[in-house]
Every structure is written in structure tokens, then in C-alpha cells.
Curated annotation (Swiss-Prot):
Note on how the cofactor is bound: Binds 1 lipoyl cofactor covalently.
Matches recorded under InterPro entries: Biotin_lipoyl, GCV_H, GCV_H/Fam206, GCV_H_sub, Single_hybrid_motif
UniProt-recorded name of the protein: Glycine cleavage system H protein
Organism: Stenotrophomonas maltophilia (strain K279a)
N6-lipoyllysine modification, residue list: 65
Organism ancestry: Bacteria, Pseudomonadati, Pseudomonadota, Gammaproteobacteria, Lysobacterales
Length: 131
């Protein structure tokens, strides 16, 4: 498993959130998740302007093996999407925590970030996972 960046927060469902410091949060799926899914062939991103609600499905990633819902780790308005993923969904496989980001949300409740798992807690959740 690759190194988990220390500046990220996570959901147990393998989404990550990076607080950008300007009230915005970049979201993607973890390296662990892309590894389980295998080669991604399709990404369905939210629309810019869509309302994101913490813990609710907002996007879909599809691989040759399975389709998987992506849940928003925080609530807010989607202000940017990584449209490059439409043509190159495999970018998530190649760089899950960098170029493979999925969308950016403008936070409505900064407290929600504190409810997410830190990298150590996420690593522990992975160890206890039955996968």
C-alpha cells in the first residue's frame, strides 16, 4: 500500500478530503480504493453548483470489475470538478492523492472536517477491514 499523505482526512468508505485553507476542500478516492477497484474506465463527476452533503453519494467510479459510489466527506457546494478524468479516468489509478482528485467543495460547515478520520485512524481502519 502506498504512503498515506499526512494532510488528508478520510471516510471509512475510502474518500479523502484535503482542506485547502480557503474554505475549500478537494476530494478524491484513496489509493486503497483504486487498488481494490482495479483499472478505472469511467468517472461520473458531480455538476459544478451541486450541493454536496456529508456521507451522501455524489459521484461514481467504474472499473472493469465494478462500479462504486463515491460519498462526499463534507457538506457544501461543488465549485470545481476535475474534468480531465472524463478522458483519463486511469489518472486516479496512477495518482489517487494528486492529479486524480475528483472535485472541490466550498464548505458550509467547517466542523465536519473534525469528524473525518486522520491518516493514522484511516490506516487502522484499513488494517481492521475484512477486504
Amino acid at each position: 500500500m502506498s504512503e498515506i499523505p499526512g494532510d488528508l482526512k478520510f471516510l471509512k468508505s475510502h474518500e479523502w478530503a484535503r482542506v485547502e485553507g480557503n474554505g475549500r476542500v478537494t476530494v478524491g478516492i484513496s489509493d486503497h480504493a483504486q487498488g481494490l477497484l482495479g483499472d478505472l474506465v469511467y468517472v461520473e463527476l458531480p455538476e459544478v453548483g451541486a450541493d454536496a452533503k456529508a456521507g451522501e453519494q455524489i459521484a461514481v467510479v467504474e472499473s472493469v470489475k465494478a462500479a462504486s459510489d463515491v460519498y462526499s466527506p463534507i457538506s457544501g457546494k461543488v465549485v470545481e470538478v476535475n474534468s480531465a478524468l472524463s478522458d483519463k479516468p486511469e489518472t486516479i489509478n496512477e495518482d489517487a492523492y494528486g492529479e486524480g482528485w475528483m472535485f472541490v467543495v466550498e464548505l458550509t460547515n467547517a466542523e465536519e472536517v473534525n469528524e473525518l478520520l486522520d491518516p493514522d485512524a484511516y490506516a487502522e481502519a484499513l488494517e481492521n477491514d475484512d477486504h
